[in-house]
Amino acid sequence: MPPDRLEGVALVTGGGRGIGASIARELTEAGMRVAVTGRTAEQVNAVADDIEGLALLGDVASADDVGSWVEATERELGPIELLVANAGMGAGDSASWDMPVDDWWRVQEVNVLGVHLSTRSVIPLMLDRGRGRIVITGSGSAYLPGTRSTAYATSKAAVCRYGETLANELAGRIAVFHFSPGLVRTEMTQRFDDDLPWTPPELAPQLVRVLASGRADALAGRYIHAEHDDIEDLIARAGEIAADDLNSIRLRR
């Protein structure tokens, strides 16, 4: 199947580097006008220049900054059709009891509060217009047992549940997706060993492109993995997936 062609405006938080930058480029190639956000001017401006998009600076954990991003995007580019809540941070390898409390909490502010501030800023606008989609970048840390980084694992587990609950709240009005990009080589993961099962970097942007198209709306609220799931297969089996409650994180007894 040829790649989906898209239109409209997308806001990609954390779009100045890594997975976010790749998503911004993919959406631009698909036909969308894209605004990218971040804290490092050099990175954000470079991506915005590359895609002929809009660069927005600030902190995703600041309600004022996020609100200004949404206002600027709608003023400069038009109504936001797609939010990609991608901004996030890692937590290093410090033992949980050695990690300063403020550092531990900062991970929650960026990875959890940042997602909430982003979604709550666009949802009223999308509801008023009767259209829109939200894609939240998660992690396998939401469900895989780990041996380090309680800060990161906690934040991603929270975002996973947040995404599913939000999808249920908005069912039939706005499609909300939560996906894992896999283990992608980025600035955040550069300290990891080379022999780990790295995910091809193009898979996450390609998945987001499909989610933005509307073809996968029946999968809203489901957990989707960029590498381990075949999105076209999931779309074809959407009825079965809903009936059997697949692609979900549950307590089984």
Locations of regions flagged by a protein language model:
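The beta1-alpha1 cofactor-binding region of Rossmann-like NAD(H)/NADP(H)-dependent oxidoreductases
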Residues: L57-W69, V101
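Alpha-helical segment proximal to the catalytic Tyr-Lys
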Residues: P124, N168-E169
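C-terminal helical subdomain
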Residues: H178-F179, D194-R253
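Catalytic Tyr-X3-Lys loop
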Residues: W97-H116, R131, V135, V159
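Active-site helix of classical SDR
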Residues: T119, S155
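Conserved glycine-rich cofactor-binding loop
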Residues: G14-G18
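Conserved mid-core segment of classical short-chain dehydrogenase/reductases
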Residues: G90-W105, R148-A151
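Residue(s) in the substrate-gating loop at a strand-loop-helix junction
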Residues: S139
